[in-house]
């Protein structure tokens, strides 16, 4: 990752929101945080996106963002729907023997129909 960053010199690193409830999202955020911390010579910005975090009723009080960015993506709605549909284990009852199923509720899935995606800029 470091060699890639030295070659492409990104201004930012993007990861799922640090308070997401799924271990793979938390791990991805941890990797991004470690990378930003390990490159103090560059002023990298960590941007976080919400997946399950939208279901958090107290999101506005504890998201911890330095800034909130919106990216217009109305022309990508169909692709976003298709991408969400690829997550079969979260969109249907494919997994029926888990103690805690994690099906995406319809109101959360409907967020892919928004013409804007929201990103949280992390505090350093």
Give the positions of each predicted feature.
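Metal-dependent de-N-acetylase/amidase catalytic core
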Residues: 1-124
């Amino acid at each position: 990752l470091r060699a890639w960053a030295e070659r492409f010199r990104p201004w930012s690193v993007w990861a799922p929101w640090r308070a997401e409830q799924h271990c793979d999202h938390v791990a991805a955020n941890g990797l991004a945080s470690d990378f930003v911390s390990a490159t103090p010579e560059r002023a990298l910005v960590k941007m976080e996106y919400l997946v399950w975090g939208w279901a958090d009723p107290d999101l506005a009080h504890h998201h911890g963002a330095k800034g909130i960015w919106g990216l217009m993506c109305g022309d990508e709605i169909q692709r976003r729907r298709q991408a969400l549909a690829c997550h079969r284990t979260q969109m249907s009852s494919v997994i029926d023997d888990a103690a805690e199923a994690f099906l995406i509720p319809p109101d959360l899935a409907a967020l892919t129909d928004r013409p804007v995606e929201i990103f949280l800029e992390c505090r350093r």
